[in-house]
């Protein structure tokens, strides 16, 4: 019989009580364990019943204990469990045997069932007593647990208290081998790292390996791209960057995995350059699969890292265990720019991997074959000659001259052919379009590739500068041979002023084209660059806003890397395809003089051309009342020019079309000068208004002591699309931005009644007032007339009425309280 306590325990376990039922012929069915006993009272299969009954016990215990804790107990005796199971079923077997011999009533069957269940419940109770959970490592050593938590959270007070009281040592660990320094490093807790290394009670060892990967704290910091933590380890401790974790990765490998270009540059300068001493890293050191850092950078498609590694001599021909060179791994991402850099660096495009596949077959497997073919063609390889380098028959300088002077020939032919008054309008127009498009196509296919291997090469070629200068040349020729002989004395002042403007825009055009726009000097010694990096780290500014990762030099304020000249330009304004040069601190004044003088020259040329047409009208006896001589939509003098001077008429019309973007460019440049902005800064300001903030690779710790003043930097503009490129070519992109800001100023309001001004939402650090900004742009030094004609010798220019060197400008002059509006 089952006593009262057993019945109460049975009621307290509903899972078992619900699954225990009386079956046919008196069998005991335990559904939870899925075991069955036959009508003869024998267990069908001893091993199966043993397993199934144990399952029933486990299911019972699941309702009262945490299964994980139960399974974790090491003192569970398998033999005792089998004995308990045998005892549990002995009651049931004996009872059913008597049942077969005497055929007792059904109440005896219920008694047997209860006894069997009582045995199972007793087993469960015994197991519960035998499987009490043991305390965890954290519970056994709460002080060490508190230390780890404090390091993760950056609680310096708690860390110093635990270490100074001697409750724990800095190098104490749990069974995983992870130290407090590991947790402080990976959580970017610089003050905690410093304390653990420098305290007088228990100093941490930066070379202890821990965790599943058996990595050092330096490894953990490198894997997460934490520059300031790594710098502290390298400079102030004996942390060894050559140590390897269980995956055979050293500090440089892990830094490449992080894709933080600033950390990679730091390690290259401090450990791989000629300035490194004892902590020397080999740039081509491989892991256990023979993969170098360049292999990993190529696999990740990380262009900045690839360029940095190549700058330090990384070998593009290194092979791993699968005979893959970095180029093969680059096909995993298939980025065109990455493939082009590796191909241009001398990668063997016919190298085969362990499967016998070269770059072409790998490209097919990765669905980037077409991209690879484009890359090879842009790199100057000939598909008709086994992809060998093409033979260049034209010198690059000659190619540039041909591109530049082609419009000098094409434009006059087009203007002369388009004499629509004589008939054949469609054939003449068709011929002109074909001539213009055909010449550009020939230049793009045959001439431009001799000096520029890019897909969109037209904007970066001298073609647009040739179109402008060719137009100006034929305007000057027309003025000299048509207008001056006829109107020299009638319009003497106009001709004199026009000649002055012609001289100004021609001189400023070629001067702005050939002058150095303001290249920031790049140190030739890596030790100088490393010193610049350390200076930036000290003030918490080592990021891509303050360091150029393309040229490896500290970026002065208002500078920007030019993808046209491949150099860092001081006070960068924009790249202008019409002058075939960047506009920077040394040629910005020249560019504005060019735009202003060109604007007025176009107006005067148009004015004098109309006067010439009017003079021709009087001399030719043109009858304005004769309907047959009139022109649709044209005045009488323009009609005469259309019929009698069609070359000059077409040239004037072409100049007026160009005048649209010239006028807008004048307005925008004037507005930006008055606001103390450059074109690039104005574009970046628009992005800030739209909250498109760029990532600058900064890993500055939150607990870093910022003792220097904060610098206002502009974010880079968004990537251009087709429409924005067209707007930039004709100078309307800045107009669009100005209109956007104007619309926001009109329709956007703050929560108050006051009008919202987008330009005032962010402080412009270079805006010192309209008057000061205007004078700063035109004068170098004191405000004297002679100084307006001076051009910067290097990077000097005025800012807030003070001469500054834009090559070394790292702080803005403070604004005065009485800044003019």
From Swiss-Prot:
Catalytic activity from the UniProt record: L-cysteinyl-[protein] + hexadecanoyl-CoA = S-hexadecanoyl-L-cysteinyl-[protein] + CoA
GO MF terms held by the record: protein-cysteine S-palmitoyltransferase activity
Cytoplasmic topology ranges: 1-400, 444-463, 516-589, 672-821
Lumenal side: 422, 485-494, 611-650
ANK repeats mapped onto the chain: 142-172, 176-205, 213-243, 247-277, 289-318, 322-351
Gene Ontology annotations for the cellular component aspect, listed alphabetically: early endosome membrane; Golgi membrane
EC number: 2.3.1.225
Limits of the DHHC domain: 546-596
Topology relative to the membrane: Multi-pass membrane protein
Domains: entry comment: The DHHC domain is required for palmitoyltransferase activity.
Family from the record: Belongs to the DHHC palmitoyltransferase family. AKR/ZDHHC17 subfamily.
Name of the protein this chain belongs to: Palmitoyltransferase AKR1
Gene name in the database record: AKR1
């Amino acid at each position: 019989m089952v006593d009262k306590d057993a019945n109460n325990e049975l009621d307290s376990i509903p899972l078992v009580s619900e699954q225990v039922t009386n079956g046919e012929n008196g069998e005991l069915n335990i559904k939870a364990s899925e075991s069955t006993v036959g009508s003869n009272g024998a267990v069908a299969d001893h091993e199966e019943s043993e397993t199934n009954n144990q399952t029933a016990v486990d299911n019972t215990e699941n309702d009262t204990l945490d299964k994980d804790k139960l399974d974790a107990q090491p003192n569970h005796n398998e033999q005792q469990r089998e004995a308990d199971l045998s005892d549990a079923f002995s009651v049931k077997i004996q009872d059913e045997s008597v049942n077969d011999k005497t055929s007792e009533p059904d109440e005896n069957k219920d008694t047997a069932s209860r006894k069997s269940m009582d045995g199972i419940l007793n087993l469960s109770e015994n197991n519960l007593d035998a499987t009490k959970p043991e305390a965890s490592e954290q519970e056994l050593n709460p002080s060490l647990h508190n230390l780890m938590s404090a390091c993760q959270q950056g609680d310096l007070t708690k860390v110093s208290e635990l270490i100074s009281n001697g409750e724990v040592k800095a190098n104490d660990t749990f069974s995983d081998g992870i130290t407090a320094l590991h947790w402080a490093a990976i959580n970017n807790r610089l003050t905690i790292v410093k304390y653990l290394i420098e305290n007088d009670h228990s100093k941490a060892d930066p070379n202890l390996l821990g965790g599943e990967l058996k990595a050092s704290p330096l490894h953990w910091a490198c894997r997460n791209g934490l520059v300031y933590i790594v710098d502290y380890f390298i400079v102030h401790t004996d942390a060894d960057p050559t140590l390897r974790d269980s995956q055979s990765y050293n500090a440089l490998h892990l830094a490449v995995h992080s894709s933080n270009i600033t950390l990679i540059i730091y390690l290259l300068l401090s450990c791989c350059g000629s300035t490194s001493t004892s902590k020397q890293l080999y740039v081509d050191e491989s892991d256990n699969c023979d993969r170098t850092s360049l292999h990993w950078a190529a696999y990740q498609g990380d262009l900045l890292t690839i360029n940095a590694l190549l700058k330090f001599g990384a070998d593009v021909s290194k092979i791993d265990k699968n005979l893959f060179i970095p180029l093969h791994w680059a096909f995993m991402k298939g980025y065109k720019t990455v493939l082009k850099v590796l191909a241009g660096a001398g990668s063997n495009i016919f190298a085969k991997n362990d499967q016998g596949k070269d770059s072409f077959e790998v490209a097919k497997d990765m669905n980037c074959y077409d991209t690879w073919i484009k890359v090879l063609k842009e790199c100057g390889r000939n598909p008709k000659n086994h992809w060998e380098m093409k033979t260049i028959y034209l010198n690059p300088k000659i190619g540039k001259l041909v591109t530049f002077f082609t419009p000098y020939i094409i434009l006059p032919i087009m203007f002369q052919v388009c004499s629509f008054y004589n008939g054949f309008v469609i054939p003449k127009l068709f011929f002109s379009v074909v001539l213009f498009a055909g010449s550009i196509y020939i230049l793009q296919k045959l001439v431009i590739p001799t000096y520029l291997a890019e897909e969109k090469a037209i904007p970066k070629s001298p073609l647009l500068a040739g179109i402008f200068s060719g137009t100006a040349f034929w305007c000057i020729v027309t003025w000299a041979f048509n207008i001056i002989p006829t109107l020299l004395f009638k319009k003497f002042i106009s001709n004199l002023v026009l000649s002055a403007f012609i001289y100004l825009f021609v001189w400023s055009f070629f001067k702005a084209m050939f002058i150095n726009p303001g290249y920031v000097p790049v140190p030739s010694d890596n030790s100088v660059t490393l010193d610049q990096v350390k200076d930036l780290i000290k003030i918490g500014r080592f990021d891509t806003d303050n360091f150029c990762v393309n040229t490896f030099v500290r970026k002065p304020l208002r500078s920007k890397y030019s993808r046209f000249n491949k150099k860092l330009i001081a006070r960068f304004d924009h790249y202008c395809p019409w002058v075939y040069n960047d506009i920077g601190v040394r040629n910005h004044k020249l560019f504005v003089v060019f735009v202003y003088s060109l604007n007025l020259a176009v107006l005067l040329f148009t004015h004098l051309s109309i006067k010439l047409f009017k003079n021709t009208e009087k001399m030719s006896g043109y009858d304005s009342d004769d309907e047959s001589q009139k022109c649709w939509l044209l005045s009488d003098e323009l009609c005469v020019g259309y019929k009698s001077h069609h070359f000059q008429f077409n040239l004037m019309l072409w100049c007026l079309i160009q005048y649209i973007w010239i006028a807008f460019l004048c307005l925008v440049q004037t507005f930006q000068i008055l606001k103390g902005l450059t074109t690039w800064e104005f574009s970046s300001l628009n992005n800030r208004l739209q909250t498109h903030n760029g990532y600058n690779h900064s890993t500055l710790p939150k607990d870093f002591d910022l003792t220097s003043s904060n610098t206002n930097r502009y974010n880079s503009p968004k990537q251009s699309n087709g429409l924005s490129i067209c707007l930039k070519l004709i100078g309307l992109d800045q107009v669009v931005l100005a209109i956007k800001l104007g619309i926001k100023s009109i329709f956007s309001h703050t929560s108050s009644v006051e009008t919202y001004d987008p330009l005032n939402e962010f402080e412009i650090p270079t805006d010192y007032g309209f008057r000061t900004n205007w004078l700063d742009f035109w004068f170098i030094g004191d405000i004297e007339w002679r100084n307006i004609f001076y051009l910067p010798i290097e990077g000097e220019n005025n800012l807030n009425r003070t001469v500054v060197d834009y090559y070394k400008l790292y702080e803005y002059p403070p604004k005065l309280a009485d800044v003019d509006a």
